[in-house]
Amino acid sequence: MNSETPAAGPQQAQPPATLTIASRESRLAMWQAEHVRDALRKLYPACDVKILGMTTRGDQILDRTLSKVGGKGLFVKELEAALADGRADLAVHSLKDVPMALPDGFSLAAIMEREDPRDAFVSNDYASLDALPAGAVVGTSSLRREAMLRSRYPHLEVLPLRGNLDTRLAKLDRGDYAAIILAAAGLKRLGLEARIRALLDVEASPPAAGQGALGIEIAAHRDDVAAWLAPLHDPQTALAVEAERMVSRALGGSCEVPLAAHAVWRAGELYLTGRVSTTDGKRVLTAEECGAVVTVADALALGRAVSDELEAQGALDIVQALLAGSQAAGKGDA
């Protein structure tokens, strides 16, 4: 089974004796793992819940952008190996870092209630993007954010920004950048909300699919773990991110493509926006749909409707050109 959202678990799951959580070792990743650990300890007081900290290839390769070194899967492969060989029972991820299609043998057992999905503007000297002078250097790790900046603020210089959250803030503080764009959720989770000078409007800068949500991955055959995790699952968040991830999956999206997808609940309906851009920001395609979403199938259908609309506008031409360019660049780097 490789489904994105789990079936409902039993009402009473036999409490586990031990559980091991695989996590990256960055401060934010460990906060997320500890958040899940604490929730599990509250559910199962007698359970010995441990965290297995791991360094992934994505954490080790800091001199190149993700789009040039293998994409978001670099952050999860080592954790999946720990799930496969039994060193860990579950792995906690920022859902935006999870590839749109999981490898065979793995599934998302729970998607937790979402934090703020927006992008955050962080600067020591300027109050907003609009306040930045021409030529100011803005750092971002995301092609999606880069495309937005090049489209809306062509007078700014956009440069890559890699490293964990603390490393990125340190680079800002030592003057490498006039401002940086980060996910608001990570800053808030680490108690760094005061660093946020402005939150970017989701209409102007739609976030990445799954941004702000935590996903808990397991080996697909571990029905016992899925049952234990069922109380952590937030159905409304899950349906929203299912729709978002479907947009990206249908278009073949990855970190090589500036692709955004954001869903929000309004008056009982799910409103979904998808956006695909060229990296220079000169071509921006946007599609919006809404509907009553009750089941995973409904969410996937809504995501497919948005991806179909983007395809009709020429999104696949953009995606294929970007992927071809990325592959050519990769061959040159080898």
Curated annotation (Swiss-Prot):
Its EC number is 2.5.1.61. GO terms for biological process: protoporphyrinogen IX biosynthetic process. The modification S-(dipyrrolylmethanemethyl)cysteine is found at residue 255. Keywords: Porphyrin biosynthesis, Transferase. Pathway: Porphyrin-containing compound metabolism; protoporphyrin-IX biosynthesis; coproporphyrinogen-III from 5-aminolevulinate: step 2/4. It catalyses: 4 porphobilinogen + H2O = hydroxymethylbilane + 4 NH4(+). GO terms for molecular function: hydroxymethylbilane synthase activity. It is an enzyme of class 2 (transferase). InterPro entries: HemC, Porphobilin_deaminase_cofac_BS, Porphobilin_deaminase_N, Porphobilinogen_deaminase_C, Porphobilinogen_deaminase_C_sf. One of its GO terms (cellular component) is cytoplasm. Belongs to the HMBS family. Monomer. The porphobilinogen subunits are added to the dipyrromethane group. Tetrapolymerization of the monopyrrole PBG into the hydroxymethylbilane pre-uroporphyrinogen in several discrete steps. This is Porphobilinogen deaminase. The gene is hemC.
